[in-house]
């Protein structure tokens, strides 16, 4: 719908609104006859005609009027000066029914108003639509300006938000850096404190370890070299009891006699330790009947490096040095190749094992002690008369580490968990030494224990059963 249509419609509505005004013009209910009009000089007719011509109205049909009877009008003539009496017939116009005319006019008026309002609303909607289309069109200068203004406002807000975010980020970064520096300082102080306490703790621990090692050495030396055993004390006590001396006689013993007795005991102990160094029975002594069954590869250098020296027992002839006293002389040992190896020994007889002693050259006379074994393991079994080298039935007896800071002859007791019975074969395994890659030397290996108690033979009834048959 165009603008011209809207304007034309509006004019039509205005004309429609003016229609009731023209139709509702009030006219006189009295109609004068023609003679009266002529008597009045034709003024009324002329006036009526003039009115009808100016307003474009049609003359009303007077035949519809109602005759109300004659009406007498008096008029004075100015020319003659006489009174003229004219009889005029008065008629009343029959009125149309107002209710019907008002109803259809009201309906038309309401319809026209509604139609006009509808047309106006439609026109406004069309105009608004065109304005929106023009605003959304990119070619419109007004819409582009508004868009630029909107974008500029949006960019300014985005810039403000960006600046706020950057400021917040910078402040947070500063706070984080300060916190990191503070934590780093505290961590550094804490680390220094921990290191200081750790160093102090390590120093104290080293002191405790040194004291423990010295105490262990003292205990081992005391255990390894007992001057007077319990059996000897009991024997001395028995000898004193056999002397048949009473308290008075004992009180009369002189100091010289006590010194002589003590000297006698000391000489016996010295002789005993000079003979073997420990004062304990060695069941792996070669001169007592023990021998080496087999061993790992020997380390032989020089003329005697041939394997022809190996006997039928798969042991070298010089392996007997491991079961013989070396008397502390350097070089009186049997070297085995590498840092790992083993030696299997047949004892002089079945025993109940108690301890084992591994001996190396003394520190005071040694040239190099790096060939001494370090981590060792001892196992044993009872094989009987058959001399076999099987290790399947071997039972672990003890594990130990040979320490170069202790005495050259170190004794190790069997494990408490190993409830071993009789054994006649012992195997020594070493898995490392104290630094030598070429060989490991064993000066002497001893086995301590006690022989089993002899079982008394109890008489049976075999002789009694066989006596009647002999008869």
From Swiss-Prot:
Q: Which residues lie on this side of the membrane: Perinuclear space?
A: 129-471
- What residues does the SUN domain cover? 288-452
Q: Where are the transmembrane segments?
A: 106-128
Annotated compartments = Nucleus inner membrane; Cytoplasm, Cytoskeleton, Phragmoplast; Endoplasmic reticulum membrane; Nucleus envelope
| Gene3D superfamilies, per database record | Galactose-binding domain-like (2.60.120.260)
| Residues bearing the modification Phosphoserine | 63
Query: What's any GO biological process attached to this entry?
Result: protein localization to nuclear envelope
Q: Which residues carry this modification: N-acetylserine?
A: 2
Tissues and organs where the protein is expressed, per its UniProt entry: Expressed in roots, hypocotyls, cotyledons and leaves and inflorescences.
The reply to whether Zinc figures as a keyword in the UniProt entry is: no
Q: Which domain of life is it from?
A: Eukaryota
Q: Which Pfam families match?
A: Sad1_UNC
Record function comment: Component of SUN-protein-containing multivariate complexes also called LINC complexes which link the nucleoskeleton and cytoskeleton by providing versatile outer nuclear membrane attachment sites for cytoskeletal filaments. Required for the maintenance and/or formation of polarized nuclear shape in root hairs. Modulates the anchoring and mobility of WIP proteins and RANGAP1 in the nuclear envelope (NE). In association with SUN2, may be involved in telomere attachment to nuclear envelope in the prophase of meiosis.
Name under which the protein is recorded: SUN domain-containing protein 1
